[in-house]
Amino acid sequence: MKAPVRVAVTGAAGQIGYALLFRIASGEMLGKDQPVILQLLELSNEKAQAALKGVMMELEDCAFPLLAGMVGTDDAEVAFKDIDVALLVGARPRGPGMERKDLLLENAKIFTAQGAALNKVAKRDVKVLVVGNPANTNAYIAMESAPDLNPKNFTAMLRLDHNRALSQLSLKLGKPVGGIEKLVVWGNHSPTMYPDYRFATSDGASIGDAINDQEWNAGTFIPTVGKRGAAIIEARGLSSAASAANAAIDHVRDWVLGSNGKWVTMGVPSDGSYGIPEGVIFGFPVTTENGQYTLVKDLPIDDFSQKYIDKTLAELEEERSGVSHLLG
């Protein structure tokens, strides 16, 4: 049996946490031969800690052979001690009448503290996925607050946008989603992100040629993917939790176990590619192998695409400048 991998999950008793933990414990994220120890962080209030205890009781009651241990805590340094993987799910949701900039600042406090705790106690090669919104900027804050860790350890989740775009293409084409490759989602995990199927194929055939409808692309596809989260809230009365958890599992699984040459979208610190300033956490196409990701380089960017990339970058730059004073 392999040595257990330590996985931290923040916001562990929340909706996404609840949809995530049982799948991690069953081996869906790191492999069916990989034991895990779950290190679960929740808010210190009585209600959150009681809910966390209940989730841990349920995890016990599943008798997962791969679940080698659990820790439940309200202390980030306990939750992040010696961890291999961190899923930072917990974030301050936007309350009624709350300005976006206030939300940014509230979350900046959380992710500054969590970045510092990771810096202090996590393994040096820890893989960090930020799910809590605004994910790109929260990941940037955590990364900047952990100066002793490699910036490449920090990623933001754009896999939900990627999966949403895959499914819209599958519906449009009437073809199975599993045959679609080389889709890209550029930018911020927000309605400004740009799903781009110019390079995508379905069973090897060009999707751009098959659809060949720029009006559908600009008027239906891009806005449908961008506003999908809001559409789910309207329909369900709650934000997307199971699909977000599923995307987190996809992201970490591919990062750790490899994407087998397939392109996937990850929010990663830019190395200056595609004109994105260095250090900005931006959705890019990557391939993954041996626990490392590699940017897909030198894709041509046409004028239509550049306009969308510029727009999502401008939003990220604005978010970054809104919190920069907190990062020294």
UniProtKB/Swiss-Prot annotation:
Family annotation (InterPro entries): L-lactate/malate_DH (IPR001557), Lactate/malate_DH_C (IPR022383), Lactate/malate_DH_N (IPR001236), Lactate_DH/Glyco_Ohase_4_C (IPR015955), Malate_DH_type2 (IPR010945), NAD(P)-bd_dom_sf (IPR036291)
Residues noted as binding NAD(+) in the record, renumbered to the chain: G11, A12, A13, G14, Q15, I16, G17, N107, Q114, V131, G132, N133
EC id: 1.1.1.37
CDD domains assigned: MDH_chloroplast-like (cd01338)
Active site: H189 (proton acceptor)
Function: Catalyzes the reversible oxidation of malate to oxaloacetate.
PANTHER family membership: MALATE DEHYDROGENASE
Catalysed reactions listed for this entry: (S)-malate + NAD(+) = oxaloacetate + NADH + H(+)
Family, per entry: Belongs to the LDH/MDH superfamily. MDH type 2 family.
GO biological process: malate metabolic process; tricarboxylic acid cycle
Chain residues that bind substrate: R94, R100, N133, R164
Keywords: NAD, Oxidoreductase, Tricarboxylic acid cycle
Organism: Xanthomonas campestris pv. campestris (strain B100)
GO molecular function terms attached to this record: L-malate dehydrogenase (NAD+) activity
Gene: mdh
Protein name, entry field: Malate dehydrogenase
